[in-house]
Amino acid sequence: MLPRPLRLLLDTSPPGGVVLSSFRSRDPEEGGGPGGLVVGGGQEEEEEEEEEAPVSVWDEEEDGAVFTVTSRQYRPLDPLVPMPPPRSSRRLRAGTLEALVRHLLDTRTSGTDVSFMSAFLATHRAFTSTPALLGLMADRLEALESHPTDELERTTEVAISVLSTWLASHPEDFGSEAKGQLDRLESFLLQTGYAAGKGVGGGSADLIRNLRSRVDPQAPDLPKPLALPGDPPADPTDVLVFLADHLAEQLTLLDAELFLNLIPSQCLGGLWGHRDRPGHSHLCPSVRATVTQFNKVAGAVVSSVLGATSTGEGPGEVTIRPLRPPQRARLLEKWIRVAEECRLLRNFSSVYAVVSALQSSPIHRLRAAWGEATRDSLRVFSSLCQIFSEEDNYSQSRELLVQEVKLQSPLEPHSKKAPRSGSRGGGVVPYLGTFLKDLVMLDAASKDELENGYINFDKRRKEFAVLSELRRLQNECRGYNLQPDHDIQRWLQGLRPLTEAQSHRVSCEVEPPGSSDPPAPRVLRPTLVISQWTEVLGSVGVPTPLVSCDRPSTGGDEAPTTPAPLLTRLAQHMKWPSVSSLDSALESSPSLHSPADPSHLSPPASSPRPSRGHRRSASCGSPLSGGAEEASGGTGYGGEGSGPGASDCRIIRVQMELGEDGSVYKSILVTSQDKAPSVISRVLKKNNRDSAVASEYELVQLLPGERELTIPASANVFYAMDGASHDFLLRQRRRSSTATPGVTSGPSASGTPPSEGGGGSFPRIKATGRKIARALF
C-alpha cells in the first residue's frame, strides 16, 4: 500500500476517477501481461482469501429438480469487520423435463448457472425432441399470463433470448417437424409483445421471421459430380501421377468441408450409439459422411497398393494390374509421403486413414513390397504410427492436437522440409474417432436418469464439454485457404474400392502365403495388441470392408522353413503400439475368429513396417504372428495395467451368430458388479433379441491359441475373464455337452477343428518342439 501523501500526489484523475492505491508486479507466465495493477488496494488479498475460504456443498430438491448448492464463507482480514454473509451458487444437477424448461426460462439462471442454457440446447436431443421442447416453452409462457405483468415480460424476454441463441448455435434443430409449435409460439410472442409495448414484439417478429426461414428452407443447388456413374473406373495406380502435396491438399479440402458441416450434437453417444437400430438409419448424417470419406481414403490406399479395381460385389469380380514388388514399394512410399503432407497440413483425419490402411491385413502382409521400401519412408511411417498409439488413451494424438492448434507452423520435429507459405492457411482437421470414443464412453459410464426418474443433467454437462471442443476446432478449421483440383477429385470419385474378401484374395494372389522370403531372424517380432476401446467408434451400418482385422483361414498347415515363427512366439509378451479405426463394422464377418495365417504378420519391432492389420473394433484379440501351422502361446494382451484388474470396468467385444444374417459384434461395458446373466441379457437387447431367453445362452471368452473360456452362469464376468483377450462369443448352450466350464483348446468360435488351428494336443506340441529344435540347431 502506498503512503497517503504519495497517493495524493499521484492523484491526477478527474473527479469520480479511480486512484492508484497499490502496485504489484506479476509473472507474465501467470497471465495478465508483464505487470499488474491492483485497484482498490485489496484485490490480491481478496483472491488469496477466496482460495482459503471454506466451501460447503449440498443438494437441494425443489419442484422436481435437484440443485447442487455451493456455499463459501469469506472471512475479512480485519477482525473488527463483521462477518459477511456466505456466497452461494446453485447448479441444476438433475430434474424432470418440465423442471429443466422452467430453469431454462428462469431469469436468475443466467447469473447463477451460466453454462446451463448452452449445455441444454446442445444436448437436448439426447432426451427430448425439438417440437416437444418448443411446446413446453409455450406451456410455460402461457402459464405465466395470470402472473404480474413485469414477471411475464421478463420471462418472455428470456424466452426470446433462448430462441435467438438456439437459432444461432443450432439452426439444424428447426426442421419442418417444428412448424406447429413455432406457430403457437409466434401467436403468443406477438400478442404478448405488442400488448407490452416495450419493443418485445419487434424483437419477436424478427425472431419468428428467421425461424420461418429455417423451417421452410430453399433447396440448395447441389454440385454436379465430377465422375458420372457410366464413366469407367479410375486406375488406382494413377496416384503416382499426382504430386504428394497436391493430393494431400485435396484430401484436406474434402475433409475440412465435411468437418465444418459436422453437427456436433449428432456425435452424442445416445444418438451415435443407436444409429444401427431399426428406424434410426436417418440419424447422424454428418457423422456418417465423415466416416464415409475416411473409408474412401483408406480404400484408395488399399486398391492402389494392390493394383486392383472392383468390378462387382463377388470375390472374383476384380481387375488386377500386375505389379512387381519394387513397383508396389513405390506406391507404399507415395502414400507415406501423402500422409506426411497431410500431417504438415494438420489434417489428422487423412493421416490416420492412410496409416490405418497401410496397417491393414492385405497390405502389411506384403513383405516383399515392404522390403523394397526406402529406409527414410519406413522411418516416417513409424513416426506417423506413433502419433495414433492407443497408449494412455491416445495421449500423444490428443497432446499433439492441442499443440498444433496453438502453433502457427505445422512442422514435425523430424521433418526436414521448410515451412510452407501462408497461402494454404493454418486450419486443422482432427480425427473424429477420438471424440466419438469419448462421448460413447461418457454415455456408457453414466446413467441417463437417476433412480427417481430425473434426467441426469450432470452427464449432459460433461458431454457438452466435449462438444465445445469440437466447436472450437471447427472455428480453427476455417483457416484453410485451398483451391480444388478437379483432376484429383475426379480420380478420387472414380475409384471403386475393393470389398474385404476381394482385397484379401488379391493380396494372397500377389504374395501367396509362405511364398515370399521371410525377413532376417535377427529381431523379435512382437504380436499385435489391441486396446479395448475401439468398438465405441463402431459401425455406421453401411458395410465398408476395406479396413478390418478379420483373419481368413488358409487351406491347411504349412511347415515353417525359418526360425521366424519361433522368434515371433518368444516375443508375444511385448506390446506393439496400435491404432483404432473410424470405419464401418461389418454386418457379417464369419472369418473373424478363424486361425491366423501367414497373411497376418506383424513387422519387426525395430522396423517401421506396418505393425498389424487395421481393425474396426476393439478387443478383437491378438492376431497371431507367424503361419497357421504355429499355435500362438503367451500373453495376448500385454502391457502393464491392461488386465481386468487395471480398473473397475472394461469394454468387451461380443460376437453373436444370427443365422443367415451372419454375425454382429457389440461392445458391452462390464463392471466389477456384473454377473454373466446380466451381461448376456444386455447383449441380447443390443441385438434386438428377447432377454427373457438369456438362460439358453452361454458367454464364452475367446483366448489366443484358439482356446475358449466358458464363463459360468453364476460367475462375475469382470473377475472370471482372462486378461489375455477381450473377445467374447455369445452362443446357445450345448445341451449334449457335459464338459465343465473352463478353458478348452478345442474348436474355436468359428468352428475350426483343432487340427487346423493351434490346438494344445501332445502330438502337436511334440511336433512343434522338433520344429523349434531344427530352427535353433
Swiss-Prot record:
Recorded GO CC terms: cytosol
Domain of life according to the entry: Eukaryota
Gene Ontology process terms (BP): negative regulation of cardiac muscle cell apoptotic process; positive regulation of phosphatidylinositol 3-kinase/protein kinase B signal transduction; Ras protein signal transduction; regulation of Ral protein signal transduction
Biased composition (Low complexity): 581-610, 618-632, 740-755
Keywords (A to Z) from UniProt: Guanine-nucleotide releasing factor, Phosphoprotein
Segments forming domain Ras-GEF: 243-513
One matching Pfam family: RasGEF_N
Domain Ras-associating: 648-735
Listed GO MF terms: guanyl-nucleotide exchange factor activity
Regions of compositional bias (Acidic residues) in chain numbering: 43-54
Subunit structure, as described in the record: Interacts with SAMD9.
Name of the protein described by the UniProt record: Ral guanine nucleotide dissociation stimulator-like 2
Provenance organism: Homo sapiens
